[in-house]
Amino acid sequence: LQAKIDAAADNATITLDSDTTITETLVITGKTLTLDLNGCTLRMTGTGSVLKVSGRATLTITDSRPQNPHTGSDAGLPAGGVITGGKADKGGGILLDGGCTLKLTGGCITDCHAIGTVGGGVVLNGDTAILYMSGTARIENCTAGETWGANAIFNSGTMYADGGTVDGTVNNQGTIRLSEGAAAETVFNGTVYNRSAGTIKAGRYNETVENRGTITGGTFCGGVTDDGGTIEDGAYETVKFNSDNGAQAKEEKVLRGQKVSNPAAPTKSGHTFTGWYLGDEKYNFDTPVTAPLTLTAKWEKVPSSGGYYYYHPTTDTKADDTKGSPKTADPGVALYAALSLLS
């Protein structure tokens, strides 16, 4: 396979036609190349990264048969193209040097290991290294000497989190962002350590982000632990509570992906509060907030109380009534009846 890589022209595509075993790291240098895993397994049995990208090269990894099952000794591997078995000081799966670009659009990097502390799956080795992750690409079941050293990805460059899934810890000392016009975001299913030099601008984080750096965007379903970092306004959504009782609407900022707290019930004279509504639906406060919201209070009128009122004078100004004379009116006696109507 290395001979094919060396002989390939710039912008060529190499397609695996069978499961492939290597004993030394495959090196792509000084050219733009696409590797189609084609549902096959690329397995390292020696020591070193499975792939190394150097010399300002660009490597795109695709998988034209993502549902292809594996059999025999590989039966336990995920379906589709797989990169596996790497064992290196750093970057067990792929080591990406500064000035190089890696585009992961398909396939799975699994069961790769960093013997040292850094990056079992992929390492961006320098601030000019660039990773684009999108499509059905996955990184899973990789390890490093220390979990903070990133089982899955160690990033000191720029990662464009345009899709795909990362299972395992990530150490970010560079930037995680979104490509302009990207329709999807990478899902991170492990703890992300955002170091002091790190910036997170995009991505969906289902586990905790430990933040020493800067967060300007993203969706944080697992929450953020403040470790001396900064979270800017772009990472928050505004929830407006319109109580519809004459009081000014209240606003609350919520970290995107977190839940807004159910506030104390408002009051309105002559009415009973029935809940907060988003449009015509009663709002579920267990729902993560991912966009600006306006919640409106709904009210029911309280039935007004009613009854009869009878008034009798305490004195009578007439000494006697003329017997047998009909009374058409008596100014000293009043009878008032009020009937309540439900409204």
Regions found by a protein language model. Give the residues of each.
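Extracellular/surface recognition and adhesion modules
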Residues: 4, 16, 35, 61, ...
